[in-house]
Each structure stands twice: as structure tokens, then as C-alpha cells.
């Protein structure tokens, strides 16, 4: 199953060039035709080239005819250039079957594409972090399997198990949303159908609020993740989305992985679970946790902007979009 994969850098400059080369080599060894953008290793300040260079890279990716347009890494930089993206060109590429894949700062591109065109992109790996590790380490099996499923057109959903604390919370949501047509049962069993799956990195998404690049999704399934953000900062960004009315317009909030932060003595017991508990007290919709997506090795791929169905039975959750 050979695919044409176009690798480009729309955000931060590639810092680990060895990992970049290893990622290219791995994808090539899998039988794929890997095309590297001419500016993939460009550098300007902390960016992969100046704004014009990175815009041109996006447009070259869209015009490449590749099956997959895969970012080299995240970082920062896409919010600077959202106003210059040729969204009609990107939409044409998506309509022809191109799969735009990325994570982290790529949330800005995905949100803007959804807001401006309704096009579906994929939250998933970047080249370096997912495929660029040094031997004997190998790409995570679950991530690699999901990536293969995407390339073969076989990916139809993702399942996971919430931590034990989620059992009671899931059961509570059945009463809250019982006025909606859904399957209910013991232990917090319910389903939510025909809802737009959207979201990504919480910091990036919240930074777009109030702009024309923030998707106006109602009755959606909002998934969120972040890295190196203390729980109080996560709560602050969630509060912004809450006060703006975004969270109350969704059918469910699905929290992924929030990693690489450090608690301090001043927190006095305040932790990520405190944020989850607070969020559940503020909204009248299910709040699920532990989605295997974020700045972690083990992650699923998610279609941003696609209609999806959420099934929950006790601690077990499943997203279907196929």
C-alpha cells in the first residue's frame, strides 16, 4: 500500500534534523513515496522560514497531489499566517482526497479550514515525534496502526477506557441528557449521534476565539488536549470557552492527554482532576476523559470536522465516524 506523502513545515523550525531524516527514512521503508517540501528545513527566528515561506509551503502541499500532507512538527507560527492561506485551494485538495495530518499548532490550520470551508482534516502525528525516534525505539504500535488505517481508508473509529473516577460521572450524565433521543442503560450507557467532531490543542483553539478562524460548531463533540500547561492554566482556558458560550453549545466534551506540567506545594491538592470536577459542575453535558490523543506516543487519529457518533457504556467509550 504505497502512498504519496508530502512533508512540509508550516509552524516551528525543525530542531532535530536527525529525527526528521529518520522519519523520512521510516516512511520510505514502509513503501511510501515521500516528497519533502523545498522549505521543510528552512529557519527564520523560531519559525520554519518567514511567514511568506511557510504560506508557500502550505500551498505547495495543497497543490502536490499527494495522498497525505504531513507536518514535520508543531511549535508555533500558524496563527500568524491564517489570513494568507488560500482556503479554496486547500478545500479543492481535500475534496480530491488529500488528507492533511498534524497536531499541536496545526490546530490553528484545522480550525481555520473548518471555519472557512467545512473541510475535514486529521488530528494525528507529526513526522519527527511519531516516526523520527532513534533505533531500537519504534513508532508506537497504536499510532502506527491508526496511521495505516487512515492511509488504507479503513479507519472507522477509536475506543478507549476512562479512569475509574469517570464511572459515576458518566452515570450522572444520563439523567442530564435523557430528554434527548439516545440509548440509555445501567452504568451510564448512552449514545450521541450525528455530531461534528472538532477541537485539538486547547491553547491554540482558545487563542482563536473571537476570530473568523474559530469554528462555529453547535451540538458538536469537542475534544481537547495540551502539553506543558499547569492545571490552573487549563482551567482558565476552559473558563474562557465556557464564558464565551462555546462549551454550552456542545453535546459532549472529550478530554485527551494533558502532559508535562509540574505541580507545586502552593497548589495544595489542586490538580488536573480538580479541573475535571470543576468543569463537570459547570456544564450540563458529558465530560469524558483519557482519550488517547495529545502530545503522547500512543494516540489515535481523529477527523476534525467530520460527523461522528459517541457511544459510552460505563467506563468504555467509542467514537465512530466511518
Predicted regions and their residues:
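ATP/NTP phosphate-donor binding region
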Residues: 1-65
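N-terminal amphipathic/basic leader segments beginning at the initiator methionine
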Residues: 1-22, 159, 165-181, 318
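N-terminal glycine-rich "phosphate-gripper" loop used for MgATP/nucleotide binding
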Residues: 68-84, 103
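Short, acidic/small-residue loops that bind anionic groups at enzyme active sites
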Residues: 87-112, 116, 120-127, 286
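Conserved anion/nucleotide-ligand pocket segment
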Residues: 120-203
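Internal helical hairpin/lid segments
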Residues: 210-265
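ATP/nucleoside-binding phosphotransfer catalytic cores, i.e., glycine-rich phosphate-binding loops
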Residues: 255-322
